[in-house]
Curated annotation (Swiss-Prot):
The keyword Mitochondrion does not apply. This is Protein MGF 505-4R. The lineage of its organism: Viruses, Varidnaviria, Bamfordvirae, Nucleocytoviricota, Pokkesviricetes. The keyword Mitochondrion does not apply. Pfam families: DUF249. Belongs to the asfivirus MGF 505 family. Plays a role in virus cell tropism, and may be required for efficient virus replication in macrophages. Keywords: Early protein. Induction: Expressed in the early phase of the viral replicative cycle. It comes from African swine fever virus (isolate Tick/South Africa/Pretoriuskop Pr4/1996) (ASFV). It comes from the Viruses.
Length: 501
């Protein structure tokens, strides 16, 4: 059962000024050698009415003095009992450690709250762990003096390397510097790997400090190492890392900036290309081609084009090839705005490489290209399947076959390319088989075949029309057309056909 006095001590946040030392002692609110003690917040106390300190700090001091009455009071004020252990260690109060230690599951949990290296080490001893555990925790909690104290234990390169890596990853700069200057390390370059990975400029500068003060034994050629660092920084968009590296050597060449292009880091490109001593015009042209391949943003492409003054005569063909190969035509859009039109050669390339119908649709929509032009281009390349897919996408209903039929006939009439005509005539005949034509329309189609010298299609259709009324005189009419058009093969076949009549 709690007494009224206990309840008052726990919940009284403001002690009346009229309370003298005797009353405060009676209430248990007096701290020997310090004065009055009152709670002013959940996490702070007021000592002698003029000093504010945290509850945990007061608990640490009280424990170091062995004052259990004040300890109990502060614990009732929500103090952390970890600070009882810390204070007890500072004051060598092992009776308190014995009393409160049973509440501690793992003494490692307390280490983060300890500022004093000696207390830190004493606390770690309570865990009954080995020296390597102490070193590892000393690194974790930035206790350099503990590492310096136990320097003689750090003799194995592989073990040191592990500790060094931990220090780098934990970003304990003083420890990293001391280890790099003092210990034998298996892979000292790890500091650079971590610096780039964590984007830690301080680690990078420490690494270079160790490297160029001859404290770091690296087998690589320094120029190669610095170039590698420049490439990594360019790929990650870390301009300040590049500038720091350049203080020590290295060269920003095409290979370095190509990494910036691949990852669309425009700020780096602008910074170094503006300083023309780094790159030739040919290098910038090659960077532009790399940007096309890597689907760079419009801003990056425009930046590179601006440094070429939009003059691309030397690489026009290469631009077309890179666009066709990669499938990203953003550069073509930008160039067209500058009156440089590469749309047709690129479209031809896309058709050659049989890009998907959806892709072609998007392309012709972007550049307002008429579908008839695409069909003609595909026909010239003999891409029959592509034409079929394209038409199926555009004309999705079966009723549209008649429309397609008329469209293809019109295209044949305006096409001069022989192979292109043959491709379209094959498709026209396939559609003829799928739709219904009356006698008049059939004769009209036969006449169309004769005019365009489509002998195979003509003969195939004649088999279907052989028994139609008026077919014989119509064949003679077709012969006249073939003679006028000078189609020898067609003439020969019609003459043979007329004999069977």
């Amino acid at each position: 059962m709690f007494s009224l006095q206990d309840i008052c001590r726990k919940h009284l946040f403001q002690v009346p000024d009229a309370f003298d030392e005797y009353i405060l002692q009676a209430l248990g609110l007096y701290w020997e050698k310090h004065g009055s003690l009152q709670r002013i917040r959940k996490d702070a106390v007021f000592v002698q009415r003029n000093l504010t300190i945290s509850t945990n700090e007061a608990l640490r001091i009280a424990a170091s003095e062995g004052n259990e009455r004040v300890i109990n009071l502060l614990l009732s004020w929500e103090g952390n009992f970890h600070y009882v252990i810390i204070g007890a260690l500072e004051g060598n109060r092992y009776d308190l450690i014995h009393k409160y230690g049973s509440q501690i599951k793992d003494y490692h949990m307390i280490l983060s709250s300890i500022q004093n290296a000696n207390t830190f080490e004493k606390c770690h001893e309570l865990s009954n762990c080995d020296m390597w555990c102490l070193i590892d925790n000393a690194i974790k909690y930035n206790m350099l003096s503990i590492l310096q104290k136990h320097r003689n234990f750090l003799t194995e390169e592989l073990e040191n390397q592990e500790f060094f890596e931990t220090a780098c990853e934990e970003q304990k700069y003083d420890i990293v510097l001391w280890m790099g200057q003092t210990l034998l390390l298996d892979e000292p370059k790890f500091i650079f790997d971590t610096a780039f990975k964590m984007v830690d400029f301080s680690l990078l500068t420490i690494g270079y400090s160790l490297l160029f003060d001859n404290k770091m034994d690296i087998q690589d050629d320094l120029t190669s190492l610095l170039t590698e660092h420049l490439e990594i920084a360019a790929a990650k968009g870390q301009l300040y890392f590049m500038l720091e590296t350049l203080k020590h050597g290295g060269d920003v060449n095409f290979e370095v900036l190509s990494k910036a292009v691949e990852n669309d880091h425009r700020k780096i490109l602008d910074y170094f290309i503006r300083r023309q001593q780094y790159l030739s015009r040919e290098d910038i042209e090659n960077l532009l081609l790399s940007a096309i391949t890597n689907c760079a943003s419009k801003k990056t492409l425009n930046l590179l084009l601006s440094y070429l003054n939009y003059s691309i005569k030397n690489i026009t063909e290469k631009i077309v090839q890179h666009v066709i190969k990669g499938g990203d035509y953003t550069i073509i859009i930008l160039l067209k705005k500058k009156k440089i039109n590469l749309v047709e050669p690129v479209l031809t390339g896309f058709i050659d490489h049989y890009y998907g119908n959806c892709f072609i649709e998007n392309f012709i929509r972007e550049f307002a290209i008429r579908p008839e032009k695409v069909i003609k281009m595909a026909a010239r390349k003999g891409k029959l399947n592509m034409i079929i897919e394209f038409l199926n996408e555009k004309y999705v209903h079966k009723d549209d076959l008649g429309t397609i039929f008329k469209l293809l006939k019109n295209l044949v009439c305006t096409m001069k390319h022989k192979k292109g005509k043959e491709t379209l005539l094959i498709l026209i005949h396939e559609i003829y088989r799928a739709i219904h034509l009356d006698t008049k329309e059939k004769f009209k189609l036969l006449r169309f075949y004769v005019m365009h010298d489509a002998t195979i299609q003509f003969l195939s259709m004649c088999k279907d029309c052989f028994n139609l009324a008026g077919f014989k005189p119509f064949v003679l009419e077709c012969l006249d057309i073939a003679i006028k058009k000078n189609h020898p093969n067609m003439i020969e076949n019609i003459e043979i056909l007329s004999k069977y009549e």
